[in-house]
């Protein structure tokens, strides 16, 4: 692949094999849930409880460029956020890089169906997913729709794969 071509060209071609080896580990532990399901909410609560090892939950304040970023629900290197708390404010790469120093696992709840009206949220979400992927942080999401069905103002099919690969 020539880097002089746009990245969009890289993701247009489909794999011509029967097994997508990048998603094999998805069967081992579920990490995507639908927001409107009561069962999903219970499972996310269980994930947080198990991985926090029932240690005390705290809020931690990170200061980045004279801005405060509150990491709510932090316990035993797992953090839990509502989507708007982590992507809704003016967050950037520096915020997310500071966050990953504190965690090995991240739960993001209530990820909306993206459309053409919230492109800033989508950019922050894509940036966060890339940082989590690059740093091997395990991700759990609850979304309005299946992650592959989330609408987008951008061609973000590779983001779906990266989100799956954060296992």
What are these regions (language model features)?
Residues 9-66:
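Interdomain motor-coupling "hinge/lid" segment immediately C-terminal to the ATP-binding subdomain
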Residues 67-115, 119-123:
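Conserved helicase/translocase motor-coupling segment
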Residues 12-13, 103-104, 135-137:
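Short glycine-/polar-rich loops that comprise or flank the Walker A/P-loop
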Residues 109-162:
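Terminal-proximal interaction/regulatory segments of ATP-powered molecular machines
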Residues 13-17, 81, 140:
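Hydrophobic/aromatic beta-strand patches that form the interior of the parallel beta-sheet core
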Residues 6-14, 159-166:
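Conserved small/polar residues in nucleotide/adenosyl-binding loops
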Residues 55-57, 64, 74-76, 101, ...:
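A generic structural signal for short, non-catalytic loop/turn and secondary-structure boundary residues
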